[in-house]
Amino acid sequence: FQLNVIANMNNHTMLKQTSIHWHCHFQKGTNWADGHAFVNACPIASGHSFLYDFTAPDQHGTFWYHSHLSTQYCDGLRGHFVVYDPADPHHDLYDVDDEHTIITLADWYHVAAKLGHHFQLGADSTLINGSGRFAGDPTAHLTVIYVTQGKRYRFHLVSLSCDPNHVFSIDSNHMTVIEADAVSHEHCTVDSIQIYAGQRYSFHLTVDQDVDNYWIRAHPSFGTYSFHDGINSAIARY
C-alpha cells in the first residue's frame, strides 16, 4: 500500500496536525508507518503530507484506519478498508461483495472532542454509513442499503466508534458471521452482533424475505437508546 496523507485542516476548534494508524496491520519492518503520534513518528503538520508505504502479504479481511493523535478520530477522521483474498474460503457463500457491502457504525458529537464533555453524556447521533438522526430532528437523512431479493451478500461491519459499543441487527433477518477482526471464522448464525470500538465482522446475508423496507438497528451502550423516529437506524431496502 502507498497512501499519501495530506494535512489541510484549518478549523481551530479541532487539532490541525494528524497521524494515521492502519488498525491491525502488522507493519513488520515498517513500524515507522504505523501512525502512533510521538511513538512511531511525529504528527503531520498542517500544510504538509506523509507517504505511508507498507505491505500486508499475509493479511486479508476487514480493516479500518483512524487518526492516532489525541481524540481527533472522534471528530470524524476515520474510515474502513478491505483487503480481498483471491482464495477466500467463504466465496461460495455469497454472490456480492463490493463497495456497496460495507456497513460502518460511528458515534457523532455536535461539539468538537477537545471542547466537549469527554463523552460522559453519550453521542448525539449514531451514524450508519455516515448518516443518522438525533433526538428532536426526525428529518435528517438515513442511509439506505439496497439489496436484491434472492441474492447472497457478504457484508463488512466495522465499528468506527470512539466510545460506545453497539448491538447491530436487521429486522426479520439472520446473519451468518464468517470473519472476525480479519480472521476467518467458523460459521455462526445470529440475530444480532454486539460490536465494540475497533472491531470488525463479516457476515453472510441471504435476501429471502418479502420485498419491503427493513430497519437496520445499532443500539448504543449509552447515550440515546431509542429507535423512535429512526434514531440509531438505517434502512435495508429489498
Swiss-Prot record:
A GO CC term attached to the entry: extracellular region
Summarizing the function annotation, the protein's role is: Lignin degradation and detoxification of lignin-derived products. Has activity towards 2,2'-azino-bis(3-ethylbenzothiazoline-6-sulfonic acid) (ABTS).
The effect of pH on activity is described as: Optimum pH is 6 at 25 degrees Celsius. Retains over 60 percent activity in the pH range from 4 to 10. Retains activity above 50% after incubation at pH 5-10 for 72 hours.
Q: What is the lineage of its organism?
A: Eukaryota, Fungi, Dikarya, Basidiomycota, Agaricomycotina
Q: How does its activity depend on thermal conditions?
A: Optimum temperature is 50 degrees Celsius. Retains over 57 percent activity when incubated for 2 hours at temperatures between 30-65 degrees Celsius.
**What are the recorded Gene Ontology BP terms?**
lignin catabolic process
- Which InterPro entries has this protein been placed in? Cu-oxidase-like_N, Cu-oxidase_2nd, Cu-oxidase_fam, Cu_oxidase_CS, Cupredoxin
**Secretion signal: which residues?**
none
Q: Per its record, how is this protein called by name?
A: Laccase-S
